[in-house]
Amino acid sequence: RINIFPDGGVARLRLFGDVQRDWANQKNDIVELSALRSGGSVLGYNDAHYGDVNALLSEGRGLTMGDGWETRRRREPGNDWIVVQLGTSGFVDEIEIDTAHFKGNFPDKCSIQAALVEKGFDVNSAENWKELLPKQRLSANAIHKFKKEIANDFGPVNAIRLNIYPDGGVSRLRIFGKVI
């Protein structure tokens, strides 16, 4: 509630903090574990040349190419990556990667690694990460859903690392799963 005395207007009101969601009633449901509204957040990335990395976890499809995560062209060997803290720990059931509006600058391939980590872990450390989704080919301006490609008997996770090869843009990343 905001009160203005005696009169006037408010152009913008921004509230900052951490999302606290009650997961108790959703133990057997498949929910989006990665969404901003569920408490998901970006922990780190190696490049974010264009756009806003947090848009990657937003609702709906991207409105423009700037409404997503895009990296600069990579001239050196390697790949680009982003690490996402899930809203809560869970068992991954389905992964969705949306390349909306990325037509000539979408990644050729992607893979996902996941881990169950403690707060304050080093996002650059490779020792925690295990392969959840092996390399998959992506296409322009499309929603890519992966279910059967996900590693079996993976166990619970609370952080994921999206790897894109070699570079490019992703509009949305969604991780669906069961809350533990």
Model-derived features: positions:
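Trp- and acidic/polar-enriched beta-sheet ligand-binding modules for extracellular glycan
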Residues: 1-81, 90-91, 101-180
